[in-house]
Structure formats: C-alpha cells, structure tokens
C-alpha cells in the first residue's frame, strides 16, 4: 500500500498546503482509495502521479467543508472522463443527501454507478465497513462538533512462502496444484493422496494496517482502533500551548496525536491537518509541533502535500 498526502491544512488552504485529502494506492488491484476530499483535491491529483481513473472508494470522516467541498467536482470530472466502473462512498448520514443536492442543483450527470454507505451503525456496533478477500475496513466514532469517524484499513494475512523443494520431493506435479497449495488449500492428487497446503507453506505473512484519524480531540476510541497499526495518520490542528482551544473546538494538539500513537503502540505517526497559524516564519511553526510530538512518540513525521511513501508490515520492514 502506498499513501500520498494531497491536502494537509485545516480549515482553509494555504500556498503550501491544500485542505484535507489522503490517497491510498493499492497497486496489486489497480485501485485508488481516497480519505476525505477537501476543495481543490482534483487539482492536487493533476499535480501528482496518481490516476483519478483508478478511484474506487472514498471514505469521508465528517461533513465539514474542508473535508468534503472537493467531492462533487471530483466525481463530476471522473464522470466526464468516461472510464470509471463505479465509486463507493462511505461516511456520515448526511453525505448522500449532500451529494444528491449538489449534483441535482447543478444539473450534473455522473454517468457511472455511485453508491453511498452510511457508517454510523458499523462504527457504533464495531462492525466491518468493507471486506473482501484481501482487505477489511473498520471505523469508530470520534469526538468532534459534528459526527466524525476514524477508519482503519487492514490487509489480510497471506500464506507463507511455498516450500517448492518439499513439493517436488514428494512427487507433486507442478501446475494448478501448486497454486492451490500456495493458497493453503487441501488438494486431492491423481494418485489418491490428499495433501494440505498448510504443510508446504511457512507462517502467514501479515498485511499492513493504516489508520486515518480526523477530526477529533483525544479519543480513547481512536486508541482502540489504532492498536498495533503500522501507520497512524492523525490530525494535529494545534500546538500543545493551545490545548484549551483544542478542547473547545474538539480538535487535537500535536501531543494528543502523539499520546494516541504511544498508547496504541503504532509503528509510525504522521501529523496532518495543521492550522494555517503555524506557517513557517510565524512564532510557532510546523517543526515545533513535530518536536512536541516526537518528545512523546519518537517515530513521528510531519505531513506535507505530495508526501508519498510505502506502508509495509513492521515485521517485514528493514
């Protein structure tokens, strides 16, 4: 999985940072997933190496404008391109009526299947939001001024490495049989033997896990959702000195994000959703927020627009 930050500012864009959007590229399935879609996100796509035509799913944290104002235009542009097989959207209850209203009142025809999934029940009941043979997605309610949700994306474990030499030594013929054994399945051979793929594969290889957490003040629910994740993307709207304002506005400080990462035992923390007040040259800068967080959780980095990197399970990392 590859993460690309398309917007890392809170509230309004700045010259250096657009508002919230994070892309998750899944190369093995030629898909792109998007987490939030602030105004101008489709322009950020044009400045990146991402392909909008690969967009398959959009996960919306909450309905504040800096997280959703870019969505109607992006979906409309995807429709004009004529090469989408459909998009599934996941988010708060008002998401569907918001999109329907904008598209209807602007006489916009999408031209491809568009389905909206409400996540409130899944979040409150700890149910799975999305699952297929490779990936599952969970979510949890956050603490914000409007209903907001954090999302966790997990790759399912894959069978361990196949012991080819052992299969050959037992006279198992190559071909489709090997493919089934690699999947850990039981196979009946032509000579009557039944072999179990699990006997030919090493331990399962864990998949990577990513948590997207915004907007919220410090939340125990977020700690639970992020437990053991390889990557936590967490809002850090305010510096520690603005903790009182953070509580009032129900946003996180840099230290709240770091506390979440530390308590959850994640592999890496990325700070995003930074207030424009912390622009370089001001009394407090983004690097100050980074230092505050690193004092609590050392493996913390600062997001910037177009930052992109691969996310791998920690046990497979160098």
Swiss-Prot record:
GO MF, one term, reads: zinc ion binding
Which note does the record give on the cofactor? Binds 2 Zn(2+) ions.
From the record, give the transmembrane residue ranges. Answer: none
UniProt-listed Enzyme Commission number(s): 3.1.26.11
Recorded protein name is Ribonuclease Z
What is the main EC category here? hydrolase
NCBIfam families in alphabetical order: PRK00055.1-3 (NF000801), RNase_Z (TIGR02651)
Record family assignment: Belongs to the RNase Z family.
Binding residues for Zn(2+) 2: 66-67, 215, 273
Q: Which residues form the active site?
A: 66
Q: List the disulfide bonds.
A: none
Q: How does it assemble?
A: Homodimer.
What cofactor does this chain's UniProt record say it requires? Answer: Zn(2+)
